[in-house]
Amino acid sequence: MSHLQEEYIMFRKMRRAEKKAIPNEETIRLLQESKRGVLAVAGDDDYPYAVPVNYYYDAAAGKIYFHSSLAGHKVDAMKRNPKICFTVYGEPEIKDLDWAPYVKSVVVFGKAQPVADPEKKRAVLKTFAMKYYPNEAEADEEIELDFRAVQMIEITIEHMTGKEIQEK
């Protein structure tokens, strides 16, 4: 079975999927090309807590990775409950001279956990850094400065959908 698991009862089906769902290839491309997403966790007193994060998507493993400090609101929330929702959306696009833009988005449900193995953490952090830094030397320098002060969080995808809506 692929990392995109079959539909389970615990995840709702997308409304009007026949009109709004985008192909899996587009969903993956949006995850690979976007630079920021919004991570939502069950925060303090069960209030939702959503925060933008930089990330990278490892298509081969079917995992999403982002970096975090070692402590804080989202870290505490993920320790209490590893279930997360992660959303990425693309740039608005005008089609066929229509006035209202179309926007593609991806919504991921999964479980988050810190990358515990230091070697894996370093490898994941390097791949992450190469998405954002202009060259390997700068990425390596930043990793050496901050390696002990950051953690890499791995999201195991349990359910993922992609869709396109017209905002009108």
Label the predicted regions.
Residues 2-18, 93-168:
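Charged, gly/pro-rich active-site loop segments
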Residues 11-38:
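Short, basic/aromatic recognition patches
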Residues 27, 35, 62, 82-84, ...:
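A generic secondary-structure signal marking the coil-to-beta-strand transition
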Residues 30-31, 77-78, 128:
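A generic structural signal for nonpolar/aromatic side chains embedded in well-ordered alpha-helices
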Residues 34-70, 86:
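Short beta-strand segments
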Residues 38, 65, 85, 109, ...:
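Beta-strand secondary-structure signal
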Residues 56-58, 79, 156:
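Well-ordered beta-strand positions
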Residues 68, 73-101:
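Helix-adjacent hinge/juxtasegments
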